[in-house]
Amino acid sequence: MASRKENAKSANRVLRISQLDALELNKALEQLVWSQFTQCFHGFKPGLLARFEPEVKACLWVFLWRFTIYSKNATVGQSVLNIKYKNDFSPNLRYQPPSKNQKIWYAVCTIGGRWLEERCYDLFRNHHLASFGKVKQCVNFVIGLLKLGGLINFLIFLQRGKFATLTERLLGIHSVFCKPQNICEVGFEYMNRELLWHGFAEFLIFLLPLINVQKLKAKLSSWCIPLTGAPNSDNTLATSGKECALCGEWPTMPHTIGCEHIFCYFCAKSSFLFDVYFTCPKCGTEVHSLQPLKSGIEMSEVNAL
């Protein structure tokens, strides 16, 4: 029987990382709520909330506490991770939620403690009497003891995995799963697939800049268009001058590279700057010099176009 109880406890034991993640989620939610709340007062007088900031924060945290721990026995972070609080003082092995007094004292220790810490500094700053100085020293001493106790509790939590905060230990509440957790088999198929695709993507990112796109495009166009031989007549230049050998459009600022084909200035210049070994995609002639076209085209041909 004892071994079964121990196995049941170990199966329902919440991981340390899950409890710490729940605390971080709670802090993130508080920051989000406060930032959204302050956005509502941007049009008001500057510093309106600064005077009553501790009280406003306390009211917001009480509102969150009312609809999380008080009603659902779990914080927002715990609800996301399928965790809730259990009364550790209960002798019953079944789940026993925290009592009403434990919930109220949880709010007093967390919300009231933070409010008192923020307000007492303002109180001591505005009063410089000797009696207030002694009270301030006592408060600082108590705060130091609480921080030391929190550190010791955290070290014990790392060792035993129970009571993530000092408040939980003092009130006797700890985190348990909402539903019994089954032992899951870890599969690495998805991870292996992701690693494979990430490796392939990194390989493409490394390889693509090394590919000369302009040269590849010219090579493909030379394969698709049959190579032309030497010019058979004097009219070859005029006939080929109706379209750019690269873009296939009417040549803008027509230039030649030393063969009978005509190019737009931008097409030829950009291709030559991108690849110093640029050749004509139609006849394979290497670039000797980029010269403007000097031969004229009959106006009848222009009108026919």
Swiss-Prot record:
Q: Cite the binding residues for Zn(2+) 2.
A: C259, H261, C280, C283
Q: Which GO terms describe its biological process?
A: cellular response to reactive oxygen species; fatty acid beta-oxidation; negative regulation of epithelial cell proliferation; negative regulation of fibroblast proliferation; peroxisome organization; pexophagy; protein destabilization; protein import into peroxisome matrix
Instruction: Give the EC number(s) under which this enzyme is classified.
Output: 2.3.2.27, 2.3.2.36
Q: Summarize what the UniProt record says about post-translational modification.
A: Forms intramolecular and intermolecular disulfide bonds in response to reactive oxygen species (ROS), promoting higher stability.
Q: What is known of its domains?
A: The three subunits of the retrotranslocation channel (PEX2, PEX10 and PEX12) coassemble in the membrane into a channel with an open 10 Angstrom pore. The RING-type zinc-fingers that catalyze PEX5 receptor ubiquitination are positioned above the pore on the cytosolic side of the complex.
Q: Please explain the role this protein plays, according to its UniProt record.
A: E3 ubiquitin-protein ligase component of a retrotranslocation channel required for peroxisome organization by mediating export of the PEX5 receptor from peroxisomes to the cytosol, thereby promoting PEX5 recycling. The retrotranslocation channel is composed of PEX2, PEX10 and PEX12; each subunit contributing transmembrane segments that coassemble into an open channel that specifically allows the passage of PEX5 through the peroxisomal membrane. PEX2 also regulates peroxisome organization by acting as a E3 ubiquitin-protein ligase.
Q: What protein is this chain from?
A: Peroxisome biogenesis factor 2
Which organism's genome codes for this protein? Homo sapiens (Human)
